[in-house]
Amino acid sequence: MKLFFIVLISFLSLLQASKGFDFDEKELETEENVWKLYERWRGHHSVSRASHEAIKRFNVFRHNVLHVHRTNKKNKPYKLKINRFADITHHEFRSSYAGSNVKHHRMLRGPKRGSGGFMYENVTRVPSSVDWREKGAVTEVKNQQDCGSCWAFSTVAAVEGINKIRTNKLVSLSEQELVDCDTEENQGCAGGLMEPAFEFIKNNGGIKTEETYPYDSSDVQFCRANSIGGETVTIDGHEHVPENDEEELLKAVAHQPVSVAIDAGSSDFQLYSEGVFIGECGTQLNHGVVIVGYGETKNGTKYWIVRNSWGPEWGEGGYVRIERGISENEGRCGIAMEASYPTKLSSTPSTHESVVRDDVKDEL
């Protein structure tokens, strides 16, 4: 009975956090009312701020609330909300949550690697809509927290997806292993790319489960993988989607979740709530996400279903629908510029029990 109430309380807390936080115009009429709104928002999101920061945070909150209010009064296909990012500046948001400079990491890494092929090149027909969540190939939305590990979350989500598709087994995998251990070309909480992460998983014989190597958002980069037993999920390699081509990207997403990089640094993206995102964003790729489907609204607006790693309270339960099929080849927010996916051709079970190496045992 005690366990039941603990589970119930946890569920209700999550439900409350994921619900929208609404306000009306009367709460914006005076500074006193906005202060009360800010206090209500802090309670809703369990936000604690140091006393010396109170004025600064309130002013930032007021600015963001007014932006949300003005934007939502316009006739746009998406809405904003005062989510948990509402009292941080645009610069702070970019630094903490959209600061993985893909161009910088690409320059350090050099030319793209992989198999050199695109297995979906000859696909001629795809379904009008696909949602890998409905097919059971997507785990629950996760939260990278204050760590620039989006690349690890994007990589893991794509691997979880293809593993489910090939083996009919959905296993939540370890982002923390990538943060701690994939350090030759990626930089933990300082950012990275999905491609070398796919290579790491292949070359190291797979990746641990989240259960055995849980996420803690730390960036000490002390690799514990060799001292942990349990299941390991493997892949065969990875491929790239031809860049700047949404039609080719569509072929890939029709067959599996695909890792992509986007420009997620705009104020509207920071405060996104629901709808098809057509807001301002460039092609300065700074955030790794994964496309888990696509579709079209009743009024004919095409979109990608994109899974983020900022927790379920952001956006549409942790997801954003981004406009698809625009005139620019790069796609909205550069979504077609850096797309890749893991390959796994075998339909045999992909998990195996790993053992602690003898040399590691000796050290324990």
From Swiss-Prot:
Uppermost EC category: hydrolase
Tissue-wise expression: Expressed in roots, stems, flowers, buds, green siliques, trichomes and near the stomata of cotyledons but not of true leaves. Found at the hypocotyl-root transition zone, in the vascular tissue, along primary and lateral roots, but not in root tips. Never found in the abscission zone of flower organs.
Ranges of Basic and acidic residues composition bias in the record: 354-364
EC number of this enzyme: 3.4.22.-
Main location: endoplasmic reticulum
Signal sequence segment: 1-20
Domain of life (superkingdom): Eukaryota
Coiled coil segments of this chain: none
SMART domains: Inhibitor_I29, Pept_C1
Active-site residues, record numbering mapped to chain: 150, 287, 308
Sites where a glycan is attached: 122
Family classification: Belongs to the peptidase C1 family.
Protein name as catalogued: KDEL-tailed cysteine endopeptidase CEP3
Organism listed in the record: Arabidopsis thaliana (Mouse-ear cress)
Taxonomic placement: Eukaryota, Viridiplantae, Streptophyta, Embryophyta, Tracheophyta
